Amino acid sequence: MIPQTPFYYYDTALLRATLDAIAQEIAPYPNFHVHYAMKANANPRLLEIIQQAGLGADCVSGGEVQKAIDAGFPADKIVYAGVGKSDWEILTALHHNIFCFNVESIPELEVINCLAAREGKIARVCLRINPDVEAHTHTHIITGMAENKFGIALKDMLQVVQLAQQLPNISFEGLHFHIGSQITNMQDFVAL
């Protein structure tokens, strides 16, 4: 009898070839790091292969942070970029000493600072800036326009950077941008 369960076949040879191509492309740039978006597919076997190829993990939930750790990603190659982070998710990431939180707002920055202080930690953060740049992709997955709800408005950036630099349990590392998905025209990024 055939089991009544889904079956997924992954071409791991193709995955490895793709990862090798990525490694070759970034080899001339030692300070350039590629992170795999865990939300694309969090199959543990695939994550192990991706981790073994040296990529980092881009996570959007505490569960994904934990899956990345479980798959062997070094904590210093994990970035947590999700919106609406709960206290337990922030604490999970702090406990593992991940590389960086991408922060969406002043209240989120203040919560991370407070939880880091409580845990005796310094949280590394980048600020997600909404640059008001149009990405030429499907309208439902554009995230970098002023009318989108994601990130810190460009006009507020300086104020939030100054706050991040003043908070005692925050280490301000830089800026983060995400203007949309499935972008095929690289000119969209030139506007950044």
Walk through the language-model features, giving the residues of each.
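A charged N-terminal "starter" segment
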Residues: 1-123, 162, 166-172, 187, ...
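Short beta-strand segments
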Residues: 37, 124-130, 176-178
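Nucleic-acid-contacting surfaces of polymerase cores and analogous helical-repeat interfaces
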Residues: 68-73, 130-131, 138
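Active-site loop/helix belt of alpha/beta enzymes
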Residues: 131-192
